Amino acid sequence: MASYLDFEKNIQQIDEDIINAQIKGDTEAVSILKKNLEKEISKTYKNLSDFQRLQLARHPDRPYALDYIELILNDAHEIHGDRAFRDDPAIVCFMGYLGEKKIIVIGEQKGRGTKDKIARNFGMPHPEGYRKALRVAGLAEKFQIPILFLIDTPGAYPGIGAEERGQSEAIARNLYELSDLKIPTIAIVIGEGGSGGALAIGVADKLAMMKNSVFSVISPEGCAAILWNDPAKSEAATKAMKVTADDLKSQGLIDDVIDEPTNGAHRNKEAAAVAIADYVKKSLNELENIDVRELSANRMQKILKLGAYQEA
């Protein structure tokens, strides 16, 4: 059953009217309602606020990493474990083919349904998850296979066990090692890009965001609680933090924005997957013509430029 956000109520009503008309066999009404639905979708999604985009980034029906992997990869095989502690289900790693290109995909997976969400820790990786990602990245470098990172997490897990096993070290190690990989790498924020939990698999030659995704150092609710002692002011915090894809592109913090279907990725997963696949193919064609040592050097320079400013 589809889920709807507060600002999608008119869309929900028309969807329900279409279902009722189909049950009655009223084809004329269905045709009229579908046209009305297209108009309402266009109207609703034309001028979304930053907070509404945040809601879309967290939409329960939004495609997750495994959805995209299933849609864009052929002959996919999963790689498990960090070879030190355990296999963290919050990080998924697959080797397969994107068209005719061999590729490795490493993604953060939130999970669907109560049991799956709990098993995957709501997409919050433990340090062993990041170490699994790094191990697989090492395999990719060894066999000269490009990597696609799919970022979607509220943040790295802050639990006691995670801290005892070196959460901060695992994130720092990934930043260090991924910045120097001698292979083409692409990272895409497909939903939430939560702080260090996102950065740990976000160091790449190309960093892109889906149109309705967000990327921030802290959640807007956390920001509002700290600055105003009121989590209810998260909408104001979202606007002030500039968390959307367009905001980050205008600041030069990401390379590209990937357009979603007009009605959002959650209502047309196949079209969203095609957009990602096309972007990855185009980017790989560009990156594969650059010497791997130059790629590594360019990646490092891009990192060093982050946060740079000039005094007036």
UniProtKB/Swiss-Prot annotation:
Keywords: ATP-binding, Cytoplasm, Fatty acid biosynthesis, Fatty acid metabolism, Lipid biosynthesis, Lipid metabolism, Nucleotide-binding, Transferase. Its main location: cytoplasm. It catalyses: N(6)-carboxybiotinyl-L-lysyl-[protein] + acetyl-CoA = N(6)-biotinyl-L-lysyl-[protein] + malonyl-CoA. Residues 36-286 form the CoA carboxyltransferase C-terminal domain. It holds the Pfam family ACCA. Pathway: Lipid metabolism; malonyl-CoA biosynthesis; malonyl-CoA from acetyl-CoA: step 1/1. It comes from the Bacteria. This is Acetyl-coenzyme A carboxylase carboxyl transferase subunit alpha. Component of the acetyl coenzyme A carboxylase (ACC) complex. First, biotin carboxylase catalyzes the carboxylation of biotin on its carrier protein (BCCP) and then the CO(2) group is transferred by the carboxyltransferase to acetyl-CoA to form malonyl-CoA. GO terms for biological process: fatty acid biosynthetic process; malonyl-CoA biosynthetic process. It is found in: Cytoplasm. HAMAP family: AcetylCoA_CT_alpha. Belongs to the AccA family. Acetyl-CoA carboxylase is a heterohexamer composed of biotin carboxyl carrier protein (AccB), biotin carboxylase (AccC) and two subunits each of ACCase subunit alpha (AccA) and ACCase subunit beta (AccD). GO terms for cellular component: acetyl-CoA carboxylase complex. PROSITE patterns: COA_CT_CTER (PS50989). GO terms for molecular function: acetyl-CoA carboxylase activity; ATP binding; carboxyl- or carbamoyltransferase activity. Its EC number is 2.1.3.15.
